[in-house]
Amino acid sequence: MMVFVVFVMCRYKILEELGDGTCGSVYKAVNLETYEVVAVKKMKRKFYYWEECVNLREVKALRKLNHPHIIKLKEIVREHNELFFIFECMDHNLYHIMKERERPFSEGEIRSFMSQMLQGLAHMHKNGYFHRDLKPENLLVTNNILKIADFGLAREVASMPPYTEYVSTRWYRAPEVLLQSSLYTPAVDMWAVGAILAELYALTPLFPGESEIDQLYKICCVLGKPDWTTFPEAKSISRIMSISHTEFPQTRIADLLPNAAPEAIDLINRLCSWDPLKRPTADEALNHPFFSMATQASYPIHDLELRLDNMAALPNLELNLWDFNREPEECFLGLTLAVKPSAPKLEMLRNVSQDMSENFLFCPGVNNDREPSVFWSLLSPDENGLHAPVESSPLSLSFSPMQQHTVGPPQSSGFTMTSSMQPNMLDRPWMAVSAPFQQSHYL
Protein backbone atom coordinates (compact mmCIF):
# COMPACT_ATOMS: atom_id res chain seq x y z
CA MET A 1 0.00 0.00 0.00
CA MET A 2 1.41 3.38 -1.01
CA VAL A 3 1.15 6.21 1.52
CA PHE A 4 1.28 9.82 0.36
CA VAL A 5 2.63 12.35 2.87
CA VAL A 6 1.86 16.02 2.34
CA PHE A 7 4.33 18.44 3.91
CA VAL A 8 2.44 21.58 4.85
CA MET A 9 5.52 23.74 5.34
CA CYS A 10 6.36 23.34 1.65
CA ARG A 11 3.68 25.97 1.08
CA TYR A 12 5.88 28.59 2.73
CA LYS A 13 9.06 30.19 1.43
CA ILE A 14 11.35 31.69 4.07
CA LEU A 15 12.45 35.23 3.17
CA GLU A 16 14.49 36.30 6.19
CA GLU A 17 15.00 35.72 9.90
CA LEU A 18 13.31 38.29 12.11
CA GLY A 19 14.39 37.22 15.57
CA ASP A 20 15.84 34.45 17.68
CA GLY A 21 15.05 33.60 21.27
CA THR A 22 15.36 30.90 23.88
CA CYS A 23 12.14 29.18 22.85
CA GLY A 24 12.42 29.50 19.10
CA SER A 25 13.08 31.63 16.04
CA VAL A 26 10.80 33.80 13.93
CA TYR A 27 11.02 34.19 10.17
CA LYS A 28 9.33 36.32 7.59
CA ALA A 29 7.85 34.03 4.95
CA VAL A 30 5.43 34.04 2.04
CA ASN A 31 2.64 31.59 1.30
CA LEU A 32 3.43 30.27 -2.19
CA GLU A 33 -0.24 29.60 -2.87
CA THR A 34 -1.76 32.91 -1.77
CA TYR A 35 1.38 35.14 -1.77
CA GLU A 36 0.41 36.31 1.71
CA VAL A 37 3.33 37.47 3.85
CA VAL A 38 3.31 35.76 7.24
CA ALA A 39 5.50 35.34 10.32
CA VAL A 40 6.61 31.76 11.01
CA LYS A 41 7.65 30.90 14.55
CA LYS A 42 9.68 27.70 14.74
CA MET A 43 10.00 26.15 18.19
CA LYS A 44 13.45 24.84 19.14
CA ARG A 45 12.38 21.83 21.18
CA LYS A 46 11.05 18.66 19.59
CA PHE A 47 7.38 17.71 19.78
CA TYR A 48 6.72 14.00 19.36
CA TYR A 49 2.99 14.03 20.07
CA TRP A 50 0.24 16.36 18.94
CA GLU A 51 -1.09 16.56 22.50
CA GLU A 52 2.14 18.29 23.51
CA CYS A 53 1.48 20.99 20.93
CA VAL A 54 -2.12 21.80 21.82
CA ASN A 55 -1.27 21.99 25.53
CA LEU A 56 1.28 24.78 25.09
CA ARG A 57 0.26 27.96 26.91
CA GLU A 58 0.63 30.08 23.81
CA VAL A 59 -1.58 27.76 21.76
CA LYS A 60 -4.25 27.46 24.44
CA ALA A 61 -4.37 31.23 24.90
CA LEU A 62 -4.46 32.21 21.23
CA ARG A 63 -7.10 29.59 20.38
CA LYS A 64 -9.43 31.30 22.85
CA LEU A 65 -8.53 34.92 22.11
CA ASN A 66 -9.88 36.36 18.88
CA HIS A 67 -9.70 40.15 18.94
CA PRO A 68 -8.64 42.95 16.54
CA HIS A 69 -5.86 43.99 18.93
CA ILE A 70 -4.44 40.52 19.62
CA ILE A 71 -2.10 38.89 17.11
CA LYS A 72 -3.85 36.25 15.01
CA LEU A 73 -2.55 32.68 14.99
CA LYS A 74 -3.42 31.45 11.51
CA GLU A 75 -2.11 27.90 11.54
CA ILE A 76 -0.23 25.31 13.62
CA VAL A 77 1.97 22.81 11.80
CA ARG A 78 3.90 19.82 13.19
CA GLU A 79 6.28 18.13 10.78
CA HIS A 80 9.24 15.85 11.48
CA ASN A 81 8.67 16.42 15.21
CA GLU A 82 9.12 20.17 14.69
CA LEU A 83 6.42 22.69 15.58
CA PHE A 84 5.62 25.80 13.56
CA PHE A 85 3.21 28.66 14.35
CA ILE A 86 1.96 30.71 11.40
CA PHE A 87 1.06 34.27 12.47
CA GLU A 88 -0.14 37.31 10.63
CA CYS A 89 2.86 39.51 9.87
CA MET A 90 3.23 42.99 11.33
CA ASP A 91 5.56 45.75 10.17
CA HIS A 92 7.06 47.01 13.43
CA ASN A 93 7.06 46.65 17.17
CA LEU A 94 6.55 49.57 19.53
CA TYR A 95 10.10 49.39 20.85
CA HIS A 96 11.62 50.04 17.42
CA ILE A 97 9.10 52.78 16.72
CA MET A 98 10.12 54.57 19.93
CA LYS A 99 13.81 53.95 19.29
CA GLU A 100 13.65 55.61 15.88
CA ARG A 101 11.57 58.61 16.99
CA GLU A 102 13.13 62.01 16.53
CA ARG A 103 10.35 63.81 18.42
CA PRO A 104 7.87 62.87 21.14
CA PHE A 105 4.55 61.35 20.22
CA SER A 106 1.50 63.58 20.17
CA GLU A 107 -1.22 63.11 22.78
CA GLY A 108 -3.46 61.71 20.07
CA GLU A 109 -0.91 59.09 19.01
CA ILE A 110 -0.34 58.02 22.61
CA ARG A 111 -4.07 57.76 23.31
CA SER A 112 -4.52 55.67 20.17
CA PHE A 113 -1.77 53.20 21.09
CA MET A 114 -2.91 52.94 24.70
CA SER A 115 -6.58 52.52 23.83
CA GLN A 116 -5.81 49.66 21.45
CA MET A 117 -3.55 47.92 23.95
CA LEU A 118 -6.13 48.22 26.73
CA GLN A 119 -8.92 46.92 24.49
CA GLY A 120 -6.89 43.81 23.69
CA LEU A 121 -5.91 43.41 27.33
CA ALA A 122 -9.50 43.80 28.54
CA HIS A 123 -10.59 41.04 26.15
CA MET A 124 -7.79 38.82 27.40
CA HIS A 125 -8.62 39.34 31.07
CA LYS A 126 -12.34 38.78 30.48
CA ASN A 127 -11.53 35.44 28.87
CA GLY A 128 -9.49 34.27 31.82
CA TYR A 129 -5.90 35.06 30.81
CA PHE A 130 -3.26 37.56 31.81
CA HIS A 131 -0.19 38.17 29.67
CA ARG A 132 2.65 38.52 32.23
CA ASP A 133 5.13 39.78 29.61
CA LEU A 134 3.80 43.11 28.36
CA LYS A 135 6.56 45.34 27.00
CA PRO A 136 7.05 47.51 23.90
CA GLU A 137 8.72 44.66 22.02
CA ASN A 138 5.57 42.54 22.32
CA LEU A 139 3.29 45.27 20.96
CA LEU A 140 3.25 44.97 17.16
CA VAL A 141 2.17 47.82 14.89
CA THR A 142 1.12 48.10 11.25
CA ASN A 143 -0.41 51.32 9.87
CA ASN A 144 -0.97 52.56 13.44
CA ILE A 145 -2.93 49.41 14.31
CA LEU A 146 -1.50 47.84 17.48
CA LYS A 147 -1.74 44.17 18.44
CA ILE A 148 -0.53 42.30 21.52
CA ALA A 149 1.80 39.39 20.74
CA ASP A 150 4.03 36.73 22.33
CA PHE A 151 1.82 34.71 24.65
CA GLY A 152 4.55 32.31 25.74
CA LEU A 153 4.15 33.41 29.37
CA ALA A 154 0.37 33.84 29.32
CA ARG A 155 -1.35 32.29 32.32
CA GLU A 156 -4.96 31.38 32.97
CA VAL A 157 -6.46 33.43 35.80
CA ALA A 158 -8.23 30.32 37.08
CA SER A 159 -4.98 28.35 37.35
CA MET A 160 -3.78 27.77 40.87
CA PRO A 161 -0.74 29.61 42.28
CA PRO A 162 2.12 29.58 42.99
CA TYR A 163 3.20 31.03 39.68
CA THR A 164 6.71 31.06 38.28
CA GLU A 165 9.06 33.75 39.55
CA TYR A 166 10.36 34.91 36.17
CA VAL A 167 7.80 37.09 34.48
CA SER A 168 8.33 39.98 32.07
CA THR A 169 11.39 42.02 31.28
CA ARG A 170 12.62 43.62 34.49
CA TRP A 171 11.75 47.21 33.57
CA TYR A 172 8.05 46.37 33.30
CA ARG A 173 7.75 43.98 36.25
CA ALA A 174 5.29 44.86 38.98
CA PRO A 175 6.70 45.20 42.53
CA GLU A 176 4.94 42.04 43.72
CA VAL A 177 6.79 40.08 41.03
CA LEU A 178 10.12 41.68 41.93
CA LEU A 179 9.46 40.69 45.55
CA GLN A 180 8.92 37.10 44.40
CA SER A 181 5.27 36.89 45.33
CA SER A 182 3.62 33.79 43.86
CA LEU A 183 0.07 35.08 44.33
CA TYR A 184 -0.02 37.88 41.80
CA THR A 185 -3.05 38.70 39.65
CA PRO A 186 -3.82 40.32 36.26
CA ALA A 187 -2.86 43.58 37.99
CA VAL A 188 0.74 42.80 36.97
CA ASP A 189 -0.31 43.58 33.39
CA MET A 190 -1.74 46.93 34.47
CA TRP A 191 1.57 47.96 36.06
CA ALA A 192 3.27 47.26 32.74
CA VAL A 193 0.63 49.36 30.97
CA GLY A 194 1.49 52.32 33.21
CA ALA A 195 5.22 51.93 32.57
CA ILE A 196 4.62 51.76 28.80
CA LEU A 197 2.37 54.84 28.90
CA ALA A 198 5.13 56.84 30.62
CA GLU A 199 7.69 55.56 28.12
CA LEU A 200 5.58 56.76 25.19
CA TYR A 201 5.94 60.31 26.57
CA ALA A 202 9.60 60.16 27.58
CA LEU A 203 10.95 57.77 24.91
CA THR A 204 12.96 56.19 27.72
CA PRO A 205 11.87 53.63 30.34
CA LEU A 206 10.36 54.93 33.56
CA PHE A 207 12.11 52.36 35.79
CA PRO A 208 15.32 51.22 34.01
CA GLY A 209 16.74 49.02 36.76
CA GLU A 210 20.05 47.26 36.20
CA SER A 211 19.15 44.50 38.66
CA GLU A 212 16.14 43.54 40.74
CA ILE A 213 17.42 45.56 43.69
CA ASP A 214 18.17 48.55 41.48
CA GLN A 215 14.73 48.15 39.91
CA LEU A 216 13.06 48.44 43.32
CA TYR A 217 15.28 51.41 44.18
CA LYS A 218 14.25 53.27 41.02
CA ILE A 219 10.59 52.55 41.74
CA CYS A 220 11.01 53.91 45.27
CA CYS A 221 12.67 57.06 43.93
CA VAL A 222 9.51 57.85 41.98
CA LEU A 223 6.71 56.36 44.09
CA GLY A 224 8.32 56.61 47.51
CA LYS A 225 8.52 53.69 49.94
CA PRO A 226 5.51 51.35 49.99
CA ASP A 227 2.95 51.35 52.75
CA TRP A 228 3.73 48.12 54.57
CA THR A 229 0.16 47.88 55.90
CA THR A 230 -1.58 48.04 52.52
CA PHE A 231 1.11 46.19 50.57
CA PRO A 232 1.88 43.00 52.55
CA GLU A 233 4.28 41.70 49.89
CA ALA A 234 6.69 44.46 50.91
CA LYS A 235 7.42 42.49 54.10
CA SER A 236 9.24 39.93 51.99
CA ILE A 237 11.75 42.64 51.19
CA SER A 238 13.96 41.20 53.94
CA ARG A 239 16.52 40.12 51.36
CA ILE A 240 17.12 43.83 50.70
CA MET A 241 16.26 45.19 54.14
CA SER A 242 18.40 48.28 53.67
CA ILE A 243 15.72 49.69 51.39
CA SER A 244 13.29 50.05 54.29
CA HIS A 245 15.66 52.44 56.07
CA THR A 246 16.68 54.46 53.05
CA GLU A 247 15.52 57.98 52.33
CA PHE A 248 14.70 58.45 48.68
CA PRO A 249 14.91 61.69 46.71
CA GLN A 250 11.29 62.17 45.74
CA THR A 251 10.82 62.72 42.00
CA ARG A 252 7.26 63.15 40.83
CA ILE A 253 6.11 61.54 37.60
CA ALA A 254 4.83 64.97 36.53
CA ASP A 255 8.39 66.32 36.77
CA LEU A 256 9.73 63.43 34.70
CA LEU A 257 7.08 63.90 32.00
CA PRO A 258 6.63 67.66 31.52
CA ASN A 259 4.99 67.11 28.12
CA ALA A 260 2.25 64.87 29.55
CA ALA A 261 -1.26 66.12 30.26
CA PRO A 262 -2.47 66.06 33.90
CA GLU A 263 -4.93 63.32 32.96
CA ALA A 264 -2.07 61.17 31.68
CA ILE A 265 -0.06 61.74 34.87
CA ASP A 266 -3.06 60.72 36.97
CA LEU A 267 -3.55 57.53 34.96
CA ILE A 268 0.13 56.59 35.26
CA ASN A 269 0.02 57.18 39.02
CA ARG A 270 -3.00 54.90 39.32
CA LEU A 271 -1.56 52.16 37.14
CA CYS A 272 1.85 52.26 38.83
CA SER A 273 0.55 51.84 42.36
CA TRP A 274 2.38 49.74 44.94
CA ASP A 275 -0.90 48.13 45.93
CA PRO A 276 -2.21 45.86 43.13
CA LEU A 277 -5.76 46.30 44.42
CA LYS A 278 -5.59 50.04 43.72
CA ARG A 279 -4.62 49.62 40.08
CA PRO A 280 -7.53 50.05 37.66
CA THR A 281 -8.58 47.16 35.47
CA ALA A 282 -8.24 47.46 31.70
CA ASP A 283 -11.91 48.40 31.38
CA GLU A 284 -11.63 50.97 34.17
CA ALA A 285 -8.53 52.47 32.55
CA LEU A 286 -10.40 52.84 29.24
CA ASN A 287 -13.01 54.92 31.08
CA HIS A 288 -10.37 57.25 32.56
CA PRO A 289 -10.65 60.95 31.57
CA PHE A 290 -7.36 60.60 29.68
CA PHE A 291 -9.25 58.89 26.86
CA SER A 292 -12.03 61.47 26.73
CA MET A 293 -9.80 64.54 26.57
CA ALA A 294 -10.97 67.04 23.96
CA THR A 295 -8.24 68.54 21.81
CA GLN A 296 -7.94 72.19 22.78
CA ALA A 297 -6.01 75.05 21.29
CA SER A 298 -3.15 76.27 23.47
CA TYR A 299 -3.41 79.81 22.04
CA PRO A 300 -6.10 81.81 20.25
CA ILE A 301 -5.77 81.93 16.47
CA HIS A 302 -4.94 85.65 16.53
CA ASP A 303 -2.05 85.11 18.95
CA LEU A 304 -0.67 82.42 16.71
CA GLU A 305 -0.74 84.60 13.61
CA LEU A 306 1.16 87.35 15.42
CA ARG A 307 3.96 84.88 16.15
CA LEU A 308 4.32 83.48 12.64
CA ASP A 309 6.74 86.17 11.51
CA ASN A 310 9.06 85.44 14.43
CA MET A 311 9.46 81.74 13.86
CA ALA A 312 12.93 80.36 14.40
CA ALA A 313 14.40 77.15 13.09
CA LEU A 314 13.13 74.02 14.79
CA PRO A 315 15.64 72.82 17.40
CA ASN A 316 17.22 69.41 17.02
CA LEU A 317 16.15 66.91 19.63
CA GLU A 318 19.04 64.69 20.57
CA LEU A 319 17.94 61.36 21.99
CA ASN A 320 20.21 59.10 23.99
CA LEU A 321 18.86 55.68 23.09
CA TRP A 322 19.85 52.23 24.17
CA ASP A 323 19.85 48.60 23.20
CA PHE A 324 17.74 46.24 25.25
CA ASN A 325 19.99 43.73 26.94
CA ARG A 326 18.30 40.39 26.54
CA GLU A 327 18.08 38.29 29.65
CA PRO A 328 19.10 34.61 29.15
CA GLU A 329 15.67 33.28 30.06
CA GLU A 330 13.79 35.74 27.88
CA CYS A 331 11.66 34.29 25.09
CA PHE A 332 11.20 37.44 22.99
CA LEU A 333 11.06 36.46 19.35
CA GLY A 334 10.84 39.86 17.72
CA LEU A 335 7.82 39.68 15.45
CA THR A 336 8.70 42.83 13.57
CA LEU A 337 9.79 43.76 10.07
CA ALA A 338 12.44 46.33 9.21
CA VAL A 339 10.14 48.37 6.99
CA LYS A 340 10.51 52.10 7.40
CA PRO A 341 7.30 54.06 6.72
CA SER A 342 7.49 57.02 4.41
CA ALA A 343 6.11 60.05 6.21
CA PRO A 344 3.61 62.26 4.39
CA LYS A 345 5.06 65.60 3.39
CA LEU A 346 2.98 68.45 4.70
CA GLU A 347 4.02 72.08 4.91
CA MET A 348 4.08 72.57 8.67
CA LEU A 349 4.36 75.77 10.64
CA ARG A 350 4.82 75.34 14.37
CA ASN A 351 4.74 77.86 17.16
CA VAL A 352 8.15 78.26 18.75
CA SER A 353 6.87 78.78 22.27
CA GLN A 354 7.91 75.99 24.60
CA ASP A 355 4.39 75.92 25.95
CA MET A 356 2.95 75.11 22.55
CA SER A 357 1.44 71.65 22.25
CA GLU A 358 -0.32 71.75 18.86
CA ASN A 359 0.75 71.55 15.22
CA PHE A 360 -0.64 73.87 12.61
CA LEU A 361 -1.17 73.49 8.91
CA PHE A 362 -0.49 76.58 6.84
CA CYS A 363 -2.47 76.68 3.63
CA PRO A 364 -0.68 79.14 1.31
CA GLY A 365 -3.42 78.93 -1.31
CA VAL A 366 -6.15 80.18 1.02
CA ASN A 367 -5.94 83.91 1.69
CA ASN A 368 -8.20 86.72 2.64
CA ASP A 369 -7.74 90.45 2.20
CA ARG A 370 -5.61 90.96 5.24
CA GLU A 371 -3.42 87.98 6.12
CA PRO A 372 -2.89 84.25 5.53
CA SER A 373 -5.35 81.85 7.06
CA VAL A 374 -4.08 79.42 9.65
CA PHE A 375 -6.09 76.39 10.65
CA TRP A 376 -5.97 74.23 13.74
CA SER A 377 -5.34 70.60 12.96
CA LEU A 378 -8.42 69.47 14.85
CA LEU A 379 -10.28 67.64 12.10
CA SER A 380 -10.80 63.93 12.53
CA PRO A 381 -8.69 61.55 10.43
CA ASP A 382 -11.56 60.87 8.04
CA GLU A 383 -11.84 64.52 6.99
CA ASN A 384 -10.76 65.04 3.39
CA GLY A 385 -7.56 66.80 2.53
CA LEU A 386 -5.94 67.22 5.94
CA HIS A 387 -4.30 63.98 6.92
CA ALA A 388 -2.57 61.59 4.57
CA PRO A 389 -2.18 57.94 5.54
CA VAL A 390 1.26 56.66 6.37
CA GLU A 391 2.41 54.34 3.63
CA SER A 392 4.87 51.54 4.20
CA SER A 393 7.67 50.86 1.81
CA PRO A 394 6.81 48.00 -0.55
CA LEU A 395 7.88 44.57 0.64
CA SER A 396 10.00 42.46 -1.68
CA LEU A 397 8.33 39.11 -2.17
CA SER A 398 10.93 37.64 -4.49
CA PHE A 399 11.81 34.13 -3.55
CA SER A 400 15.42 34.82 -2.83
CA PRO A 401 17.64 33.07 -0.29
CA MET A 402 17.20 34.15 3.31
CA GLN A 403 18.99 37.38 4.11
CA GLN A 404 19.63 39.12 7.38
CA HIS A 405 18.68 42.78 7.56
CA THR A 406 19.87 45.22 10.10
CA VAL A 407 17.38 47.22 12.09
CA GLY A 408 18.70 50.55 13.27
CA PRO A 409 17.86 54.20 13.79
CA PRO A 410 17.62 56.45 10.76
CA GLN A 411 20.71 58.50 10.02
CA SER A 412 19.04 61.87 9.99
CA SER A 413 19.88 65.22 11.45
CA GLY A 414 18.91 65.73 15.02
CA PHE A 415 19.23 62.04 15.83
CA THR A 416 22.39 60.80 17.50
CA MET A 417 23.15 57.41 18.97
CA THR A 418 25.44 58.52 21.76
CA SER A 419 25.68 55.45 23.93
CA SER A 420 24.57 51.86 24.23
CA MET A 421 24.11 52.25 27.95
CA GLN A 422 20.67 52.86 29.41
CA PRO A 423 20.09 56.53 30.34
CA ASN A 424 18.59 57.12 33.74
CA MET A 425 15.71 59.58 33.50
CA LEU A 426 15.93 60.28 37.23
CA ASP A 427 19.48 61.59 36.84
CA ARG A 428 18.86 63.32 33.50
CA PRO A 429 15.34 64.77 33.51
CA TRP A 430 16.11 66.81 30.39
CA MET A 431 15.54 63.57 28.47
CA ALA A 432 11.82 64.13 28.91
CA VAL A 433 11.72 67.78 27.80
CA SER A 434 8.85 68.40 25.44
CA ALA A 435 9.33 69.31 21.80
CA PRO A 436 7.02 70.16 18.90
CA PHE A 437 4.73 67.25 18.25
CA GLN A 438 4.55 65.33 15.02
CA GLN A 439 1.26 64.74 13.26
CA SER A 440 -0.01 61.30 12.42
CA HIS A 441 -2.94 59.66 10.73
CA TYR A 442 -4.87 56.91 12.43
CA LEU A 443 -6.37 54.13 10.35
Swiss-Prot record:
Pfam families: Pkinase
UniProt domain Protein kinase: residue ranges: 12-291
Residue sites binding ATP per the record: L18, G19, D20, G21, T22, C23, G24, S25, V26, K41
Active-site feature positions: D133 (proton acceptor)
Reactions accelerated catalytically: L-seryl-[protein] + ATP = O-phospho-L-seryl-[protein] + ADP + H(+); L-threonyl-[protein] + ATP = O-phospho-L-threonyl-[protein] + ADP + H(+)
Keywords: ATP-binding, Kinase, Nucleotide-binding, Phosphoprotein, Serine/threonine-protein kinase, Transferase
PROSITE patterns named in the record: PROTEIN_KINASE_DOM (PS50011), PROTEIN_KINASE_ST (PS00108)
Tissue: Roots, leaves and stems.
Record's signal peptide: none
Its job: May play a role in the regulation of plant growth and development.
Similarity remark: Belongs to the protein kinase superfamily. CMGC Ser/Thr protein kinase family. CDC2/CDKX subfamily.
Protein name: Serine/threonine-protein kinase MHK
Organism: Arabidopsis thaliana
